């Protein structure tokens, strides 16, 4: 399972993630080294969507990728101070856009997940 970047020092980066299960056919990933960055990969080479869960099995994050394997959409459940100043986790999303011909992306500010999104993606959000 891919690293968070494709190349390092001119070589393919070592895999940082392992598949630990599936939910409705979508891979649930876990870091091989728990000390590394907890963000799911920015690129996907074997799936169009990945899920990450907390150690207790509750939902943490999901990312959806386009046909070029680039990150396009992310849903997360963690603190997001711009949406909730209490410090409590909040279910929110970001949309990613790319400059034509570039691998550079822009991410929108966090927005609360809509009811429509919850209906479509809720089966992946255990415990939220």
What label would you give each PLM region?
Residues 2, 6-128:
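Catalytic toxin/effector domains delivered as secreted proteins or via bacterial secretion systems
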């Amino acid at each position: 399972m891919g690293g968070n970047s494709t190349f390092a020092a001119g070589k393919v980066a070592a895999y940082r993630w392992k598949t630990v299960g599936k939910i409705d056919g979508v891979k649930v990933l876990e870091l091989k080294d728990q000390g590394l960055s907890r963000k799911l990969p920015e690129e996907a080479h074997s799936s169009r969507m990945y899920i990450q869960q907390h150690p207790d099995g509750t939902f943490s994050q999901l990312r959806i990728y386009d046909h070029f394997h680039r990150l396009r959409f992310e849903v997360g459940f963690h603190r997001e101070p711009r949406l909730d100043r209490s410090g409590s986790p909040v279910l929110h999303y970001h949309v990613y856009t790319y400059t034509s011909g570039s691998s550079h992306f822009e991410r929108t500010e966090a927005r609360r997940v809509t009811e429509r999104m919850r209906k479509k993606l809720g089966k992946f959000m255990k415990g939220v």
